[in-house]
Every structure is written in structure tokens, then in C-alpha cells.
């Protein structure tokens, strides 16, 4: 298989994948971005590739074209690539790295005989350091020839390629959002509440990161039900009500999230979800708006 790549898009994911692939023997021929400056910066980061502004025929020199742009821009990029490449796309492999979109968003290049697939590494990219991808899941779906190349790329990076049904991509992506971005929001809300309790930012962050790591270790070793702790797991609904009242007074904007996550805990962690949810429904309700209007004295 010809290990030549054109990178369309200079975002965090595309840059990181290209650099890692370059280090593992793939030839990065082209790095395309919206502007010359961005393309040059990306090529410098990758340490390979001819920087190009916009989509051009130069990308057609590669056997595989990797589209790594915001989800909404993928069809536009595919259409432009189809316009420029036409019949020269026949037999090419075109991949995109979106977690939510299916390979079908690349239909414009499929129409000219290219093979398309989506390949999403389940990993966060901060744009500063290059994340290690060994042992990370790569969710892949699409045309068989493109899937084979995507699986080869994943294995080159030490990743674990897994097949996913196209129609399940949004659910797969939502699962990642649950475990990453939403957990981060809960962590930061907890830090803010600890700071309001009198801890410094450093103390609050250290306390909750230590707690969260321990919970995740227990989750991995013991499973969800045995790892579950806190007043709700013990059926201590008086403490849950006191928590809600404290949040309503101090951070009313967090109250609905606390209540929603409590219900979610009942659904997915409790041995008897109906009983837990019933108790939660019978707790005294605290209105975030009322608490805010009374200046936190509700």
C-alpha cells in the first residue's frame, strides 16, 4: 500500500495525526489550510509536507487524502475536492476524522470513484502536545478499501481499530461527550463550589482530581455498582436534599445539573432504579430562580 498522505485542514486532530504518521514512515506530501500562514505553521509542526493555501490539485498526488476540518465544513471540502479532482479521484482513499459524521458526507468524491471512510480517534487533542495514541480506540466505517487503509493508519499509531455502524456514529460521539466534556464541566462546577466553601483553587483542584481518579480506578476494577459512593448510593436522601439546598443558595445555576445527574445515577447505577427515582421525586424542590432572586437566602 502506498503510504502517501495529503492533509486537508490544519486543526488539532489533523496536525497531530499527520505528525505521528510522519514519524512512523508515512509520507506527508501536502498540508492544506485556509491561509498560507496557517499551512506553513502546520507543516512546521508536522515536520513534513508542502504547505498549500486552500484545496488544490497538489492533494491528488497522494494515495490517501485525510480531511480534518470542522464537521460542517466536510461536505464543502469534499465538493471542492471533487470539482478540482474529478476523474483523477478514481481509486483514491478519502478519510475524514469527525466523530459524529458518517462517511456519506464525502459523497461528492465517491461520485468520482473515490473510496470514503470516517476514522475517529477517541482521544482529546489540546493542540499543544502530541497525544500518544497507543491503545486508543479508532472508530471506523465506510467503503471497504477505505476502511482497510483507515485500519492500517490506526495500527500504525498503535491504536485499536473498531468497526462502527454508520447510523450509530452520533450515539458513539455522544458517549465520548458524556465521558469527556460533560465530566469536565462537572469537575469545574465542583471546584467552584469547593472554592465557595473556603478552599483555594489549588486545594480544590487537587482534592477533586484525587477523588475523581480514585473513583475511576474503582470503576475499572470493581464495576459501576460497587464503585458507586455518596449519599444517593446509601439511600441517604436527607443529605441529598441538604446538598440541593446548599447548591440552590450558593450556585443556583448548578442545581438543575445536580438534580439531573442524580436521576441519571439512579438510572444507570442503582440496583432498584425505580425506588431511587421515586425518592428523588419526593424531595423538596429548590427553585434556582427563586434562590437567585433572593440573593442566595432561599
Which stretches of residues belong to each language-model region?
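Hydrophobic Val/Ile/Leu positions in short beta-strands of Rossmann-like dinucleotide-binding domains
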Residues: 5-7, 67, 140
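Interdomain hinge/lid region at the active-site interface
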Residues: 217-275
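Short, hydrophobic beta-strand segments that form beta-sheet elements in well-ordered domains
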Residues: 29-33, 94-97, 138-141
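Phosphate-coordination loops involved in phosphoryl transfer and adenosine-cofactor binding
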Residues: 2-4, 91, 135
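NAD(P)-dependent dehydrogenase/reductase Rossmann-like domain
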Residues: 251, 265-269, 274-298
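Internal alpha-helical scaffold of NAD(P)-dependent oxidoreductase catalytic cores
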Residues: 42-45, 109, 113, 130-221
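NAD(P)+-binding Rossmann beta1-loop-alpha1 motif at the extreme N-terminus of oxidoreductases
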Residues: 1-57
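Rossmann-like NAD(P)(H) cofactor-binding subdomain of soluble oxidoreductases
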Residues: 36, 45-46, 50-130
Amino acid at each position: 500500500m502506498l503510504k502517501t498522505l495529503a492533509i486537508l485542514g490544519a486543526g488539532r486532530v489533523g496536525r497531530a495525526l499527520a505528525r505521528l504518521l510522519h514519524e512512523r514512515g508515512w509520507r506527508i506530501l501536502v498540508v492544506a489550510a485556509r491561509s498560507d500562514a496557517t499551512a506553513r505553521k502546520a507543516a512546521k509542526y508536522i515536520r513534513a509536507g508542502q504547505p498549500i493555501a486552500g484545496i488544490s490539485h497538489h492533494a491528488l498526488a497522494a494515495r490517501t487524502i485525510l480531511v480534518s476540518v470542522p464537521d460542517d465544513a466536510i461536505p464543502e471540502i469534499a465538493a471542492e475536492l471533487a470539482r478540482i479532482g474529478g476523474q483523477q479521484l478514481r481509486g483514491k482513499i478519502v478519510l475524514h476524522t469527525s466523530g459524529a459524521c458518517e462517511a456519506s458526507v464525502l459523497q461528492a468524491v465517491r461520485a468520482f470513484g473515490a473510496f470514503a471512510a470516517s476514522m475517529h480517534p477517541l482521544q482529546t487533542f489540546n493542540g499543544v502536545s502530541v497525544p500518544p495514541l497507543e491503545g486508543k480506540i479508532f472508530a471506523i466505517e465506510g467503503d471497504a478499501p477505505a476502511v482497510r487503509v483507515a485500519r492500517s493508519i490506526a495500527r500504525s499509531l498503535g491504536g485499536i481499530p473498531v468497526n462502527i455502524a454508520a447510523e450509530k456514529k452520533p450515539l458513539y460521539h455522544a458517549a465520548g461527550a458524556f465521558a469527556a466534556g460533560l465530566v469536565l464541566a462537572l469537575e469545574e462546577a465542583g471546584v467552584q463550589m469547593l472554592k465557595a466553601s473556603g478552599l483555594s483553587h489549588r486545594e480544590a483542584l487537587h482534592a477533586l482530581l484525587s477523588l475523581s481518579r480514585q473513583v475511576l480506578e474503582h470503576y475499572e476494577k470493581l464495576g459501576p455498582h460497587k464503585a458507586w459512593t455518596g449519599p444517593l448510593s446509601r439511600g441517604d436522601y436527607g443529605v441529598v436534599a441538604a446538598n440541593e439546598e446548599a447548591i440552590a443558595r450558593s450556585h443556583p445555576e448548578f442545581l438543575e445539573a445536580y438534580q439531573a445527574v442524580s436521576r441519571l445515577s439512579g438510572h444507570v447505577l442503582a440496583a432498584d432504579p425505580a425506588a431511587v427515582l421515586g425518592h428523588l421525586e419526593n424531595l423538596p424542590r429548590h427553585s434556582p430562580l427563586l434562590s437567585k432572586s433572593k440573593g442566595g437566602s432561599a
